[in-house]
């Protein structure tokens, strides 16, 4: 998940540097969504994974 977030962030930065506003905005939005989903899944696995024997 974080890898995809980083990839979208890099695409957004390159597109912003080249002046493609629409593409940069789309890639930045996708990066934010992937990042938030990754954090949520991490927190769920962190709390659900702690089961006492």
Curated annotation (Swiss-Prot):
The UniProt record lists the keyword Aminoacyl-tRNA synthetase: no
Keyword Magnesium: no
Transmembrane segments: 4-24, 28-48
Keywords: Cell membrane, Membrane, Transmembrane, Transmembrane helix
Pfam families membership: DUF1328
Intracellular or extracellular location(s): Cell membrane
Organism domain of life: Bacteria
Gene Ontology cellular-component terms listed: plasma membrane
Membrane topology, from the record: Multi-pass membrane protein
Similarity field: Belongs to the UPF0391 family.
Protein name: UPF0391 membrane protein CKO_03415
Source organism per UniProt: Citrobacter koseri (strain ATCC BAA-895 / CDC 4225-83 / SGSC4696)
């Amino acid at each position: 998940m974080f890898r995809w977030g980083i990839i979208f962030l890099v695409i957004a930065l390159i597109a912003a540097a080249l002046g493609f506003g629409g593409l940069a905005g789309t890639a930045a939005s996708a990066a934010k969504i992937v990042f938030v989903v990754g954090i949520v899944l991490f927190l769920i696995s962190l709390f659900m994974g702690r089961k006492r024997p």
